[in-house]
Protein backbone atom coordinates (compact mmCIF):
# COMPACT_ATOMS: atom_id res chain seq x y z
CA UNK A 1 0.00 0.00 0.00
CA UNK A 2 1.04 3.62 -0.49
CA UNK A 3 2.15 5.50 2.59
CA UNK A 4 -0.66 7.23 4.50
CA UNK A 5 -0.46 10.25 6.81
CA UNK A 6 -3.02 10.69 9.58
CA UNK A 7 -3.44 14.05 11.31
CA UNK A 8 -4.84 14.63 14.76
CA UNK A 9 -7.49 17.27 15.41
CA UNK A 10 -9.28 18.50 18.49
CA UNK A 11 -9.43 20.98 21.35
CA UNK A 12 -6.47 21.74 23.60
CA UNK A 13 -5.96 19.31 26.50
CA UNK A 14 -8.25 16.67 25.02
CA UNK A 15 -5.40 14.17 25.03
CA UNK A 16 -4.27 14.06 21.40
CA UNK A 17 -0.57 13.74 22.22
CA UNK A 18 -1.14 11.17 24.96
CA UNK A 19 -3.29 9.12 22.59
CA UNK A 20 -0.59 9.23 19.88
CA UNK A 21 1.96 8.04 22.44
CA UNK A 22 -0.33 5.19 23.48
CA UNK A 23 -0.76 4.18 19.82
CA UNK A 24 2.89 4.50 18.74
CA UNK A 25 5.08 4.69 21.83
CA UNK A 26 6.37 8.10 20.71
CA UNK A 27 5.98 11.32 22.67
CA UNK A 28 5.48 13.92 19.93
CA UNK A 29 5.99 16.87 22.29
CA UNK A 30 9.71 17.30 21.64
CA UNK A 31 10.12 21.01 22.41
CA UNK A 32 11.24 21.90 25.94
CA UNK A 33 8.47 24.50 26.09
CA UNK A 34 5.89 21.88 25.11
CA UNK A 35 7.04 19.54 27.86
CA UNK A 36 7.19 22.34 30.43
CA UNK A 37 3.73 23.71 29.60
CA UNK A 38 2.15 20.32 28.96
CA UNK A 39 0.69 21.45 25.63
CA UNK A 40 1.51 20.91 21.97
CA UNK A 41 2.80 24.05 20.24
CA UNK A 42 4.24 22.77 16.97
CA UNK A 43 3.85 19.69 14.83
CA UNK A 44 4.93 16.30 16.16
CA UNK A 45 5.47 13.08 14.24
CA UNK A 46 5.11 9.39 15.09
CA UNK A 47 4.84 6.12 13.17
CA UNK A 48 1.80 3.90 13.63
CA UNK A 49 3.41 1.22 11.45
CA UNK A 50 5.74 1.03 8.45
CA UNK A 51 3.08 2.52 6.16
CA UNK A 52 1.29 5.01 8.40
CA UNK A 53 2.56 8.24 9.97
CA UNK A 54 0.65 10.32 12.50
CA UNK A 55 1.10 14.09 12.62
CA UNK A 56 0.15 15.48 16.00
CA UNK A 57 -1.11 19.07 15.74
CA UNK A 58 -1.61 21.71 18.45
CA UNK A 59 -5.12 22.25 19.79
CA UNK A 60 -4.76 25.76 21.16
CA UNK A 61 -6.39 28.50 19.09
CA UNK A 62 -3.13 30.49 19.12
CA UNK A 63 -1.44 27.74 17.13
CA UNK A 64 -4.08 27.17 14.44
CA UNK A 65 -1.50 28.16 11.79
CA UNK A 66 0.61 25.18 12.86
CA UNK A 67 -2.45 22.95 12.92
CA UNK A 68 -3.36 23.89 9.33
CA UNK A 69 0.24 23.35 8.20
CA UNK A 70 0.05 19.86 9.66
CA UNK A 71 -3.31 18.74 8.29
CA UNK A 72 -2.80 20.28 4.84
CA UNK A 73 -0.90 17.19 3.71
CA UNK A 74 -2.78 14.43 5.53
CA UNK A 75 -4.94 11.71 4.00
CA UNK A 76 -7.28 11.15 6.94
CA UNK A 77 -7.95 12.64 10.36
CA UNK A 78 -8.18 11.36 13.90
CA UNK A 79 -10.46 13.74 15.81
CA UNK A 80 -10.01 13.55 19.56
CA UNK A 81 -12.86 14.62 21.87
CA UNK A 82 -12.44 14.41 25.63
CA UNK A 83 -15.27 12.55 27.34
CA UNK A 84 -15.37 14.98 30.27
CA UNK A 85 -15.51 18.12 28.09
CA UNK A 86 -17.35 17.02 24.96
CA UNK A 87 -17.46 19.33 21.93
CA UNK A 88 -15.41 22.50 22.46
CA UNK A 89 -14.59 25.60 20.32
CA UNK A 90 -11.40 24.19 18.78
CA UNK A 91 -13.19 20.91 18.08
CA UNK A 92 -15.54 22.87 15.85
CA UNK A 93 -12.82 24.97 14.21
CA UNK A 94 -10.61 21.94 13.54
CA UNK A 95 -13.57 20.12 11.96
CA UNK A 96 -14.29 23.18 9.86
CA UNK A 97 -10.68 23.22 8.64
CA UNK A 98 -10.79 19.49 7.81
CA UNK A 99 -13.94 20.14 5.79
CA UNK A 100 -12.42 23.11 3.96
CA UNK A 101 -9.35 21.05 3.06
CA UNK A 102 -11.59 18.22 1.85
CA UNK A 103 -10.04 15.58 4.10
CA UNK A 104 -12.15 12.55 3.08
CA UNK A 105 -11.96 10.24 6.10
CA UNK A 106 -12.08 10.67 9.85
CA UNK A 107 -11.97 8.41 12.89
CA UNK A 108 -13.14 9.94 16.18
CA UNK A 109 -11.52 8.92 19.45
CA UNK A 110 -13.48 9.79 22.57
CA UNK A 111 -10.61 10.18 25.04
CA UNK A 112 -10.49 10.16 28.84
CA UNK A 113 -13.52 7.88 29.13
CA UNK A 114 -12.34 7.00 32.64
CA UNK A 115 -13.28 10.57 33.64
CA UNK A 116 -16.83 10.37 32.27
CA UNK A 117 -19.73 10.35 34.71
CA UNK A 118 -21.37 7.25 33.24
CA UNK A 119 -22.28 5.43 30.01
CA UNK A 120 -25.27 7.69 29.44
CA UNK A 121 -22.96 10.70 29.38
CA UNK A 122 -20.69 8.96 26.88
CA UNK A 123 -23.73 8.23 24.71
CA UNK A 124 -24.60 11.94 24.72
CA UNK A 125 -21.03 12.90 23.79
CA UNK A 126 -21.06 10.40 20.93
CA UNK A 127 -24.44 11.72 19.75
CA UNK A 128 -23.02 15.26 19.69
CA UNK A 129 -20.03 14.01 17.70
CA UNK A 130 -22.20 12.35 15.08
CA UNK A 131 -24.32 15.47 14.74
CA UNK A 132 -21.36 17.82 14.34
CA UNK A 133 -19.55 15.57 11.84
CA UNK A 134 -22.65 14.83 9.77
CA UNK A 135 -22.16 16.04 6.18
CA UNK A 136 -18.42 16.54 6.57
CA UNK A 137 -17.27 12.95 6.05
CA UNK A 138 -18.86 10.01 4.23
CA UNK A 139 -18.88 8.02 7.45
CA UNK A 140 -17.45 8.41 10.92
CA UNK A 141 -16.33 5.65 13.28
CA UNK A 142 -16.31 6.56 16.98
CA UNK A 143 -14.05 4.66 19.39
CA UNK A 144 -14.14 5.18 23.16
CA UNK A 145 -10.63 5.24 24.65
CA UNK A 146 -8.60 5.88 27.76
CA UNK A 147 -4.82 6.00 27.90
CA UNK A 148 -4.99 5.45 31.67
CA UNK A 149 -6.94 2.18 31.51
CA UNK A 150 -5.95 1.11 27.98
CA UNK A 151 -9.59 0.89 26.91
CA UNK A 152 -10.06 1.10 23.14
CA UNK A 153 -6.39 1.70 22.26
CA UNK A 154 -5.89 -1.59 20.40
CA UNK A 155 -9.29 -1.23 18.73
CA UNK A 156 -8.44 2.32 17.64
CA UNK A 157 -5.07 1.24 16.23
CA UNK A 158 -6.67 -1.60 14.25
CA UNK A 159 -9.33 0.73 12.87
CA UNK A 160 -6.78 3.35 11.80
CA UNK A 161 -4.73 0.70 10.01
CA UNK A 162 -7.83 -0.69 8.26
CA UNK A 163 -8.96 2.77 7.16
CA UNK A 164 -5.47 3.65 5.93
CA UNK A 165 -5.60 0.80 3.42
CA UNK A 166 -8.72 2.32 1.81
CA UNK A 167 -7.32 5.85 1.40
CA UNK A 168 -7.68 7.18 -2.15
CA UNK A 169 -4.48 8.81 -3.40
CA UNK A 170 -5.63 9.50 -6.96
CA UNK A 171 -4.55 13.15 -6.67
CA UNK A 172 -1.07 12.27 -7.97
CA UNK A 173 -0.03 14.90 -10.53
CA UNK A 174 2.68 12.68 -11.94
CA UNK A 175 5.62 14.81 -10.81
CA UNK A 176 7.34 15.24 -7.47
CA UNK A 177 6.02 17.71 -4.89
CA UNK A 178 6.85 17.93 -1.20
CA UNK A 179 5.47 20.70 1.01
CA UNK A 180 8.04 21.49 3.69
CA UNK A 181 6.87 21.52 7.32
CA UNK A 182 10.28 21.45 9.07
CA UNK A 183 13.81 22.62 8.26
CA UNK A 184 16.97 22.04 10.26
CA UNK A 185 20.73 21.63 9.87
CA UNK A 186 22.85 18.64 10.80
CA UNK A 187 26.60 18.80 11.29
CA UNK A 188 28.28 17.16 8.34
CA UNK A 189 25.07 16.98 6.34
CA UNK A 190 23.78 20.53 5.92
CA UNK A 191 20.19 21.47 5.19
CA UNK A 192 17.47 18.91 5.91
CA UNK A 193 13.81 19.44 5.03
CA UNK A 194 10.88 17.27 6.04
CA UNK A 195 7.39 16.94 4.67
CA UNK A 196 4.88 14.68 2.99
CA UNK A 197 5.26 13.69 -0.66
CA UNK A 198 1.97 14.92 -2.14
CA UNK A 199 2.76 13.92 -5.72
CA UNK A 200 5.19 11.82 -7.74
CA UNK A 201 8.40 10.30 -6.43
CA UNK A 202 11.94 11.39 -5.62
CA UNK A 203 15.25 9.55 -5.95
CA UNK A 204 18.54 10.16 -4.20
CA UNK A 205 20.85 12.19 -6.44
CA UNK A 206 17.99 14.04 -8.14
CA UNK A 207 17.83 17.79 -8.60
CA UNK A 208 14.85 19.69 -7.22
CA UNK A 209 13.52 23.24 -7.36
CA UNK A 210 13.22 24.88 -3.95
CA UNK A 211 10.29 27.28 -4.12
CA UNK A 212 9.63 30.12 -3.69
CA UNK A 213 13.08 31.39 -4.55
CA UNK A 214 13.64 29.20 -7.60
CA UNK A 215 16.76 27.61 -6.12
CA UNK A 216 18.22 24.45 -7.62
CA UNK A 217 19.35 21.90 -5.03
CA UNK A 218 20.79 18.40 -5.14
CA UNK A 219 19.27 15.57 -3.09
CA UNK A 220 22.19 14.18 -1.05
CA UNK A 221 20.13 11.73 0.93
CA UNK A 222 16.60 10.68 1.87
CA UNK A 223 15.18 9.19 5.04
CA UNK A 224 11.70 7.78 5.66
CA UNK A 225 10.59 6.37 9.02
CA UNK A 226 14.09 7.05 10.32
CA UNK A 227 15.77 4.82 7.74
CA UNK A 228 18.01 5.77 4.80
CA UNK A 229 16.18 5.06 1.54
CA UNK A 230 17.00 5.47 -2.14
CA UNK A 231 13.61 6.93 -3.03
CA UNK A 232 10.24 8.07 -1.69
CA UNK A 233 6.86 8.21 -3.37
CA UNK A 234 3.36 9.64 -3.07
CA UNK A 235 2.17 9.62 0.54
CA UNK A 236 5.58 9.04 2.14
CA UNK A 237 6.87 11.16 4.99
CA UNK A 238 10.40 12.12 4.03
CA UNK A 239 13.45 13.89 5.36
CA UNK A 240 15.39 15.22 2.38
CA UNK A 241 19.03 16.26 2.78
CA UNK A 242 19.81 19.03 0.28
CA UNK A 243 23.07 20.47 -1.01
CA UNK A 244 23.30 23.78 -2.80
CA UNK A 245 20.84 25.64 -0.57
CA UNK A 246 21.33 27.31 2.81
CA UNK A 247 19.00 26.54 5.71
CA UNK A 248 17.80 30.16 5.90
CA UNK A 249 16.58 29.96 2.28
CA UNK A 250 14.11 27.16 3.11
CA UNK A 251 11.25 27.42 5.59
CA UNK A 252 7.89 25.96 6.54
CA UNK A 253 5.79 26.80 3.50
CA UNK A 254 8.57 26.11 0.99
CA UNK A 255 8.06 23.39 -1.56
CA UNK A 256 10.40 20.93 -3.26
CA UNK A 257 9.38 20.07 -6.81
CA UNK A 258 10.57 18.47 -10.02
CA UNK A 259 12.51 21.20 -11.88
CA UNK A 260 10.46 23.35 -14.21
CA UNK A 261 7.04 22.11 -13.08
CA UNK A 262 6.07 24.84 -10.61
CA UNK A 263 6.69 28.56 -10.35
CA UNK A 264 6.72 31.08 -7.54
CA UNK A 265 3.55 33.17 -7.68
CA UNK A 266 2.14 36.29 -6.02
CA UNK A 267 -1.46 35.94 -7.14
CA UNK A 268 -3.93 33.27 -8.13
CA UNK A 269 -7.59 32.81 -8.99
CA UNK A 270 -9.65 30.63 -6.68
CA UNK A 271 -13.13 29.38 -5.91
CA UNK A 272 -13.92 30.06 -2.26
CA UNK A 273 -16.70 29.04 0.10
CA UNK A 274 -17.29 31.07 3.23
CA UNK A 275 -18.19 29.34 6.46
CA UNK A 276 -21.84 29.59 7.48
CA UNK A 277 -20.61 30.36 11.01
CA UNK A 278 -18.81 33.50 9.82
CA UNK A 279 -20.16 36.50 11.74
CA UNK A 280 -19.03 39.30 9.41
CA UNK A 281 -19.12 39.62 5.64
CA UNK A 282 -15.95 39.35 3.54
CA UNK A 283 -15.27 42.70 1.91
CA UNK A 284 -13.62 43.50 -1.41
CA UNK A 285 -9.89 44.15 -0.93
CA UNK A 286 -10.00 42.78 2.63
CA UNK A 287 -6.72 41.59 4.09
CA UNK A 288 -6.78 37.88 4.95
CA UNK A 289 -4.50 35.01 5.89
CA UNK A 290 -4.17 32.28 3.28
CA UNK A 291 -3.10 28.88 4.61
CA UNK A 292 -1.93 27.05 1.51
CA UNK A 293 -0.13 23.77 1.98
CA UNK A 294 2.27 24.36 4.85
CA UNK A 295 2.50 28.10 4.10
CA UNK A 296 0.71 31.04 5.65
CA UNK A 297 0.63 34.14 3.42
CA UNK A 298 -1.12 37.47 3.86
CA UNK A 299 -3.23 38.50 0.89
CA UNK A 300 -5.90 40.86 -0.40
CA UNK A 301 -9.16 39.40 -1.68
CA UNK A 302 -10.42 40.87 -4.94
CA UNK A 303 -14.10 40.11 -5.43
CA UNK A 304 -15.14 40.11 -9.07
CA UNK A 305 -17.75 42.82 -9.46
CA UNK A 306 -18.90 42.57 -5.83
CA UNK A 307 -18.33 44.69 -2.75
CA UNK A 308 -18.83 41.93 -0.20
CA UNK A 309 -19.65 38.26 0.34
CA UNK A 310 -21.95 36.97 3.06
CA UNK A 311 -21.44 33.90 5.24
CA UNK A 312 -22.12 30.59 3.51
CA UNK A 313 -21.73 32.05 0.00
CA UNK A 314 -19.39 30.93 -2.77
CA UNK A 315 -17.54 32.94 -5.40
CA UNK A 316 -14.55 33.06 -7.72
CA UNK A 317 -11.98 35.57 -6.51
CA UNK A 318 -8.45 36.77 -7.14
CA UNK A 319 -5.99 36.65 -4.26
CA UNK A 320 -3.07 39.09 -4.39
CA UNK A 321 -0.36 37.78 -2.07
CA UNK A 322 2.02 39.94 -0.07
CA UNK A 323 4.90 37.56 -0.64
CA UNK A 324 5.69 34.80 -3.10
CA UNK A 325 4.49 31.27 -2.49
CA UNK A 326 3.73 28.10 -4.47
CA UNK A 327 0.33 26.97 -5.72
CA UNK A 328 -1.08 24.64 -8.33
CA UNK A 329 -4.57 24.38 -9.75
CA UNK A 330 -6.63 22.10 -7.55
CA UNK A 331 -4.69 22.89 -4.36
CA UNK A 332 -6.98 23.57 -1.41
CA UNK A 333 -6.47 26.30 1.18
CA UNK A 334 -8.00 27.86 4.29
CA UNK A 335 -8.91 31.54 4.72
CA UNK A 336 -8.62 33.26 8.08
CA UNK A 337 -9.15 36.88 9.04
CA UNK A 338 -6.08 39.03 9.58
CA UNK A 339 -7.05 40.10 13.10
CA UNK A 340 -8.51 38.70 15.24
CA UNK A 341 -7.60 35.38 13.63
CA UNK A 342 -10.70 33.30 12.91
CA UNK A 343 -11.39 30.76 10.19
CA UNK A 344 -13.83 32.26 7.68
CA UNK A 345 -13.70 29.82 4.79
CA UNK A 346 -11.56 28.00 2.30
CA UNK A 347 -11.21 27.29 -1.35
CA UNK A 348 -9.57 25.67 -4.32
CA UNK A 349 -6.94 27.18 -6.61
CA UNK A 350 -8.42 27.44 -10.12
CA UNK A 351 -5.49 28.90 -12.01
CA UNK A 352 -2.27 30.76 -11.33
CA UNK A 353 -2.37 32.91 -14.47
CA UNK A 354 -4.75 35.27 -16.27
CA UNK A 355 -4.64 35.59 -20.07
CA UNK A 356 -3.72 38.99 -21.48
CA UNK A 357 -6.55 41.03 -22.95
CA UNK A 358 -9.42 39.49 -20.99
CA UNK A 359 -11.84 41.49 -18.85
CA UNK A 360 -10.60 40.19 -15.53
CA UNK A 361 -13.80 40.45 -13.48
CA UNK A 362 -16.03 38.70 -16.00
CA UNK A 363 -13.34 36.14 -16.88
CA UNK A 364 -12.69 35.23 -13.24
CA UNK A 365 -16.41 35.02 -12.44
CA UNK A 366 -17.03 32.65 -15.34
CA UNK A 367 -14.22 30.18 -14.56
CA UNK A 368 -15.58 26.69 -13.96
CA UNK A 369 -14.69 24.80 -10.79
CA UNK A 370 -14.55 21.53 -12.75
CA UNK A 371 -10.96 21.17 -14.07
CA UNK A 372 -12.02 19.68 -17.42
CA UNK A 373 -14.52 22.42 -18.22
CA UNK A 374 -12.09 25.04 -16.92
CA UNK A 375 -9.42 23.72 -19.28
CA UNK A 376 -11.76 24.30 -22.23
CA UNK A 377 -12.41 27.85 -21.00
CA UNK A 378 -8.69 28.50 -20.71
CA UNK A 379 -8.04 27.14 -24.21
CA UNK A 380 -10.70 29.48 -25.60
CA UNK A 381 -9.18 32.40 -23.68
CA UNK A 382 -5.91 32.02 -25.58
CA UNK A 383 -7.48 32.28 -29.03
CA UNK A 384 -4.59 34.28 -30.52
CA UNK A 385 -1.83 32.56 -28.57
CA UNK A 386 -2.75 28.84 -28.42
CA UNK A 387 -0.45 26.68 -26.34
CA UNK A 388 1.05 23.26 -26.95
CA UNK A 389 0.15 20.20 -24.88
CA UNK A 390 3.38 20.54 -22.88
CA UNK A 391 2.76 24.24 -22.24
CA UNK A 392 -0.77 23.48 -21.02
CA UNK A 393 0.62 20.78 -18.74
CA UNK A 394 3.01 23.32 -17.24
CA UNK A 395 0.29 25.95 -16.81
CA UNK A 396 -2.04 23.44 -15.16
CA UNK A 397 0.73 21.82 -13.11
CA UNK A 398 -0.03 18.35 -14.46
CA UNK A 399 1.33 15.83 -16.96
CA UNK A 400 1.02 15.75 -20.74
CA UNK A 401 -1.04 12.57 -20.32
CA UNK A 402 -3.60 14.42 -18.20
CA UNK A 403 -3.92 17.17 -20.83
CA UNK A 404 -4.34 14.55 -23.57
CA UNK A 405 -7.20 13.00 -21.57
CA UNK A 406 -8.91 16.38 -21.33
CA UNK A 407 -8.42 16.95 -25.06
CA UNK A 408 -10.04 13.60 -25.86
CA UNK A 409 -12.92 14.16 -23.45
CA UNK A 410 -13.65 17.63 -24.83
CA UNK A 411 -13.07 16.63 -28.47
CA UNK A 412 -10.51 19.40 -28.91
CA UNK A 413 -8.10 19.56 -31.85
CA UNK A 414 -4.31 19.45 -32.02
CA UNK A 415 -1.83 20.29 -34.77
CA UNK A 416 1.23 18.29 -35.77
CA UNK A 417 3.21 20.52 -33.41
CA UNK A 418 0.82 19.66 -30.55
CA UNK A 419 -0.91 23.04 -30.42
CA UNK A 420 -4.32 22.68 -28.77
CA UNK A 421 -7.23 24.53 -30.36
CA UNK A 422 -10.98 24.51 -30.89
CA UNK A 423 -12.93 25.00 -34.11
CA UNK A 424 -13.93 28.40 -32.74
CA UNK A 425 -10.29 29.44 -32.27
CA UNK A 426 -9.36 28.23 -35.77
CA UNK A 427 -12.27 30.08 -37.38
CA UNK A 428 -11.45 33.28 -35.47
CA UNK A 429 -7.77 33.05 -36.44
CA UNK A 430 -8.63 32.53 -40.11
CA UNK A 431 -10.89 35.59 -40.03
CA UNK A 432 -8.12 37.64 -38.43
CA UNK A 433 -5.63 36.59 -41.13
CA UNK A 434 -8.07 37.26 -44.00
CA UNK A 435 -8.98 40.66 -42.53
CA UNK A 436 -5.32 41.58 -41.98
CA UNK A 437 -4.39 40.61 -45.55
CA UNK A 438 -7.39 42.47 -46.99
CA UNK A 439 -6.36 45.64 -45.19
CA UNK A 440 -2.77 45.20 -46.38
CA UNK A 441 -3.84 44.67 -50.01
CA UNK A 442 -5.97 47.82 -49.82
CA UNK A 443 -3.16 49.88 -48.29
CA UNK A 444 -0.45 48.44 -50.52
CA UNK A 445 -2.18 47.64 -53.82
CA UNK A 446 1.14 47.25 -55.64
CA UNK A 447 2.55 44.71 -53.17
CA UNK A 448 2.00 41.10 -54.18
CA UNK A 449 2.30 39.77 -50.65
CA UNK A 450 2.62 40.68 -47.01
CA UNK A 451 5.77 39.74 -45.14
CA UNK A 452 5.26 36.94 -42.62
CA UNK A 453 6.79 39.02 -39.80
CA UNK A 454 4.49 41.94 -40.56
CA UNK A 455 1.46 39.62 -40.75
CA UNK A 456 2.38 38.20 -37.35
CA UNK A 457 2.70 41.66 -35.81
CA UNK A 458 -0.54 42.95 -37.33
CA UNK A 459 -2.61 39.84 -36.57
CA UNK A 460 -1.10 39.40 -33.07
CA UNK A 461 -1.20 35.64 -33.54
CA UNK A 462 1.72 33.74 -32.05
CA UNK A 463 4.40 32.84 -34.60
CA UNK A 464 3.96 29.08 -34.27
CA UNK A 465 0.15 29.30 -34.44
CA UNK A 466 0.29 31.63 -37.46
CA UNK A 467 2.46 29.11 -39.31
CA UNK A 468 -0.02 26.32 -38.56
CA UNK A 469 -3.12 28.29 -39.58
CA UNK A 470 -1.53 29.67 -42.76
CA UNK A 471 -0.53 26.12 -43.76
CA UNK A 472 -4.15 25.01 -43.32
CA UNK A 473 -5.45 28.02 -45.27
CA UNK A 474 -3.01 27.33 -48.11
CA UNK A 475 -4.33 23.77 -48.40
CA UNK A 476 -7.84 25.17 -48.51
CA UNK A 477 -6.85 27.63 -51.25
CA UNK A 478 -7.53 30.73 -49.15
CA UNK A 479 -3.97 32.10 -49.18
CA UNK A 480 -0.85 31.65 -51.27
CA UNK A 481 2.88 32.14 -50.77
CA UNK A 482 4.29 34.85 -53.01
CA UNK A 483 7.84 36.25 -52.95
CA UNK A 484 8.53 34.93 -49.42
CA UNK A 485 5.32 36.55 -48.25
CA UNK A 486 1.64 35.66 -47.96
CA UNK A 487 -1.32 36.93 -49.97
CA UNK A 488 -4.96 36.09 -50.47
CA UNK A 489 -5.23 33.62 -53.34
CA UNK A 490 -7.78 35.76 -55.16
CA UNK A 491 -5.67 38.90 -55.00
CA UNK A 492 -3.94 40.16 -58.14
CA UNK A 493 -2.00 43.37 -58.55
CA UNK A 494 -3.65 45.70 -61.04
CA UNK A 495 -1.71 48.62 -62.44
CA UNK A 496 -3.93 51.50 -63.51
CA UNK A 497 -3.52 55.08 -64.65
CA UNK A 498 -0.18 56.75 -64.02
CA UNK A 499 1.18 53.70 -62.22
CA UNK A 500 0.65 51.51 -65.27
CA UNK A 501 2.40 54.11 -67.44
CA UNK A 502 5.33 54.35 -65.01
CA UNK A 503 5.66 50.57 -65.03
CA UNK A 504 5.75 50.48 -68.83
CA UNK A 505 8.43 53.18 -68.99
CA UNK A 506 10.61 51.58 -66.34
CA UNK A 507 10.43 48.17 -67.98
CA UNK A 508 11.36 49.63 -71.37
CA UNK A 509 14.27 51.49 -69.84
CA UNK A 510 15.57 48.39 -68.02
CA UNK A 511 15.35 46.47 -71.30
CA UNK A 512 17.21 49.09 -73.33
CA UNK A 513 20.21 49.43 -71.01
CA UNK A 514 21.31 45.89 -71.81
CA UNK A 515 23.72 44.32 -69.34
CA UNK A 516 24.02 47.49 -67.29
CA UNK A 517 21.72 47.31 -64.24
CA UNK A 518 19.95 50.35 -62.82
CA UNK A 519 19.57 51.39 -59.20
CA UNK A 520 16.35 52.42 -57.50
CA UNK A 521 17.76 55.92 -57.04
CA UNK A 522 18.59 56.23 -60.76
CA UNK A 523 15.06 55.22 -61.75
CA UNK A 524 13.52 57.60 -59.21
CA UNK A 525 15.61 60.47 -60.52
CA UNK A 526 14.89 59.67 -64.16
CA UNK A 527 11.10 59.65 -63.70
CA UNK A 528 10.98 62.26 -60.93
CA UNK A 529 9.29 59.84 -58.53
CA UNK A 530 9.97 59.02 -54.90
CA UNK A 531 11.85 55.81 -54.09
CA UNK A 532 8.82 54.29 -52.35
CA UNK A 533 6.60 54.43 -55.42
CA UNK A 534 9.39 53.25 -57.72
CA UNK A 535 10.08 50.29 -55.43
CA UNK A 536 6.41 49.32 -55.40
CA UNK A 537 6.36 49.24 -59.20
CA UNK A 538 9.65 47.32 -59.33
CA UNK A 539 8.21 44.68 -56.97
CA UNK A 540 5.20 44.33 -59.25
CA UNK A 541 7.53 43.79 -62.21
CA UNK A 542 9.53 41.35 -60.12
CA UNK A 543 6.36 39.43 -59.30
CA UNK A 544 5.61 39.27 -63.02
CA UNK A 545 9.14 37.89 -63.48
CA UNK A 546 10.12 40.79 -65.70
CA UNK A 547 12.90 42.13 -63.48
CA UNK A 548 15.19 40.76 -60.78
CA UNK A 549 16.96 42.44 -57.89
CA UNK A 550 20.65 41.65 -58.37
CA UNK A 551 21.56 43.13 -55.01
CA UNK A 552 19.80 45.44 -52.61
CA UNK A 553 18.58 48.33 -54.78
CA UNK A 554 20.20 47.11 -58.05
CA UNK A 555 17.77 45.94 -60.76
CA UNK A 556 18.02 44.20 -64.14
CA UNK A 557 15.48 43.04 -66.72
CA UNK A 558 15.14 39.24 -66.96
CA UNK A 559 15.75 39.35 -70.74
CA UNK A 560 19.12 40.96 -70.10
CA UNK A 561 19.89 38.44 -67.34
CA UNK A 562 19.32 35.70 -69.92
CA UNK A 563 21.73 37.52 -72.26
CA UNK A 564 24.28 37.70 -69.44
CA UNK A 565 24.04 33.94 -68.99
CA UNK A 566 24.68 33.40 -72.71
CA UNK A 567 27.68 35.72 -72.50
CA UNK A 568 29.13 33.57 -69.71
CA UNK A 569 28.48 30.36 -71.65
CA UNK A 570 30.36 31.80 -74.62
CA UNK A 571 33.28 32.89 -72.43
CA UNK A 572 33.70 29.51 -70.73
CA UNK A 573 33.46 27.67 -74.03
CA UNK A 574 36.78 29.30 -74.87
CA UNK A 575 38.29 29.79 -71.37
CA UNK A 576 38.55 27.72 -68.20
CA UNK A 577 38.73 30.67 -65.83
CA UNK A 578 37.59 34.25 -65.49
CA UNK A 579 38.85 37.17 -63.44
CA UNK A 580 37.02 40.37 -62.54
CA UNK A 581 38.85 42.17 -65.35
CA UNK A 582 37.64 39.56 -67.86
CA UNK A 583 34.06 39.99 -66.65
CA UNK A 584 34.29 43.78 -66.95
CA UNK A 585 35.59 43.44 -70.50
CA UNK A 586 32.88 41.06 -71.75
CA UNK A 587 30.04 43.02 -70.10
CA UNK A 588 31.39 46.57 -70.39
CA UNK A 589 30.51 47.11 -66.70
CA UNK A 590 32.32 49.29 -64.21
CA UNK A 591 33.63 47.72 -60.98
CA UNK A 592 30.66 49.31 -59.15
CA UNK A 593 28.31 46.90 -60.92
CA UNK A 594 30.70 44.14 -61.95
CA UNK A 595 31.27 42.90 -58.38
CA UNK A 596 27.56 42.60 -57.38
CA UNK A 597 26.82 41.04 -60.79
CA UNK A 598 29.56 38.44 -60.29
CA UNK A 599 28.23 37.64 -56.80
CA UNK A 600 24.77 37.23 -58.32
CA UNK A 601 26.24 34.78 -60.86
CA UNK A 602 27.89 32.88 -57.99
CA UNK A 603 24.52 32.57 -56.21
CA UNK A 604 22.86 31.34 -59.39
CA UNK A 605 25.52 28.66 -59.79
CA UNK A 606 26.67 30.04 -63.12
CA UNK A 607 30.14 30.75 -61.78
CA UNK A 608 32.23 29.19 -59.04
CA UNK A 609 34.64 31.43 -57.16
CA UNK A 610 38.06 30.32 -55.92
CA UNK A 611 40.11 33.25 -54.63
CA UNK A 612 40.21 35.86 -57.37
CA UNK A 613 39.40 33.32 -60.08
CA UNK A 614 36.05 32.02 -61.23
CA UNK A 615 35.30 28.86 -63.18
CA UNK A 616 32.18 27.55 -64.88
CA UNK A 617 29.40 26.86 -62.37
CA UNK A 618 27.25 23.73 -62.09
CA UNK A 619 24.12 25.52 -63.34
CA UNK A 620 25.64 27.14 -66.42
Positions of predicted regions on the chain:
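Conserved G1/Walker A P-loop phosphate-binding module
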Residues: 1-57
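P-loop/Walker A NTP-binding module and the surrounding RecA-like catalytic core of P-loop NTPases
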Residues: 6-22, 62-68, 86-89, 94-97
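C-terminal effector modules of nucleic-acid-centric enzymes and ribosome-associated factors
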Residues: 8, 105, 116-121, 131, ...
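Residue-level recognition of beta-strand microenvironments
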Residues: 11, 183, 200, 222, ...
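Residue-level signature of catalytic and energy-coupling elements of molecular machines
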Residues: 13, 19, 38, 56, ...
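Conserved Switch II/interswitch segment of TRAFAC-class P-loop GTPases
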Residues: 57-62, 72-94, 99-123
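Conserved nucleotide-binding/hydrolysis micro-motifs of P-loop NTPases
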Residues: 60-61, 84-88, 103, 112-117, ...
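Conserved catalytic-core segments of large NTP-driven translation/proteostasis enzymes
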Residues: 123, 131-278
